[in-house]
Amino acid sequence: MRRLTRRLALPIFGVLWITVLLFFWVTKRKLEVPLGPEVQTPKPSDADWDDLWEQFDERRYLNAKKWRVGDDPYKLYAFNQRESERISSNRAVPDTRHKRCSLLVYCTDLPPTSIIITFHNEARSTLLRTIRSVLNRTPMHLIQEIILVDDFSNDPEDCKQLIKLPKVKCLRNNERQGLVRSRMRGADIAQGTTLTFLDSHCEVNRDWLQPLLHRVKEDYTRVVCPVIDIINLDTFNYIESASELRGGFDWSLHFQWEQLSLEQKALRLDPTEPIRTPIIAGGLFVIDKAWFDYLGKYDVDMDIWGGENFEISFRVWMCGGGLEIIPCSRVGHVFRKKHPYVFPDGNANTYIKNTKRTAEVWMDEYKQYYYAARPFALERPFGNIENRLNLRKNLHCQTFKWNLENVYPELRVPPDSSIQKGNIRQRQKCLESQKQKKQEILRLSPCAKVKGDGAKSQVWAFTYTQQIIQEELCLSVVTLFPGAPVVLALCKNGDERQLWTKTGARIEHIASHLCLDTDMFGDSTEDGKEVVVNPCESSLMSQHWDIVSS
């Protein structure tokens, strides 16, 4: 009997031990959620979403600011408000990704991100559609929060009412701060380990966030952007953009989209591969929060809007990071032809201040080409940059020459950066810009004898780009035919209507081979006040001009 007991003891003990282990394993499974990369937060069902949205009275929110029949639908927001309000906030958009994007697999443990959206007097329909597209097309476990920063809009309720929506928080500035300082405020309270900046008139596309977060998780020094599709400002149709584009710029620090070169396209074996970009558009990107803080966040002394994308792009590349456009991430954006809001110091002055700060801190000796392209920036105040210069020094950043050689070798360095600046005289009179009925016109006026606003309207700059500039405006012909008026138009590099050369005493328009003339009737009288182009004739005094340095 004792032998039998001894024989059975070991098996019984083993069974009991296994039973205990099973009990604790099952109990633990009931009490704990498994941790690690296998965790998946289920997306709410359609019914759950309906319950969440029932707490928010969408119709009441939109109707409070609805377009009224008889009003100009473009007046308030510089896009078709009537059409925007006609479209559902929950509309479907076409999947514009390459078909191979749907085959890609991303990390299962991507970190949740803080989505920061700043706005000033945004249309409620576009703001709501931006948020709803994010909630509809983003796994909920990847959204830490959606931080709205209301930059002192006229109606605080534009933002306040939206906190009823899932994940949404609302901050309001007590005075107008502009894009940079508003984004900084959102970033400072963000709880996510990554920051996702969006504009307030966007619609994100399918699986837009995962490829962005995946690249940042692989390398925290990457700053990544989606391909930006177009939402038509008139019809609000969602239009696919070309995927093989990158951001570029000229020496005036004007952003421009550019096609990849044939060589760059040939090296792309996979259409889903990230695209290195010298600069980002600045409205939509993802960055690691700790990296953002380490790099110095934004230059908070930049005002309202414009130029901040150059500053952060130069800083990222020159201080150890990189910029990428991710083809499998798509976000639609309403591109407007003008700003619907007011710049306290004027659009041009604000942009020059911001880009001048960028040039002075980051462009080293190459800033001379910025001033050659924007000669009137030399006189503009730009604030104190000591903190930003110290930041660059402490980060041990590369030179701008390194940036040109390694990041953007396609940007040609001009052979000459000299500027000829002064009055354009014809005998005792000077070429002058005058405002009439909200338009800038040209005429000959007595030359100003003292400095002041009157004198400034008679100062012109000849640049290496072969443009004749005053502030942000250039001399431009209306047509290429004799007798065509010469007007002031926004400068655009490479525009043949704005290219001139000084030949002896004449100022010749390059494309038409016509000369700047004040005698619109060709009779050499003193009565011709309109500035035109006519066939060049050395004997005509109305085509004789002297450039007198101011």
Swiss-Prot record:
Q: In which pathway does it act?
A: Protein modification; protein glycosylation
Top-level division of the source organism's lineage: Eukaryota
Name one process (GO BP) from the record: protein glycosylation
Task: Please provide, in alphabetical order, the Gene Ontology terms of the cellular component aspect for this entry.
Answer: Golgi membrane
Please report a single Pfam family linked to this protein. Ricin_B_lectin
- Catalytic EC class: transferase
User: Where is it located?
Assistant: Golgi apparatus membrane
Q: Membrane spanning segments where?
A: 7-26
Q: Required cofactors, per record?
A: Mn(2+)
The entry marks the following residues as binding substrate, namely: D151, R176, S200, W305, R336, H339, Y341
Specify the protein name: Polypeptide N-acetylgalactosaminyltransferase 14
**What species is given as this protein's source?**
Mus musculus
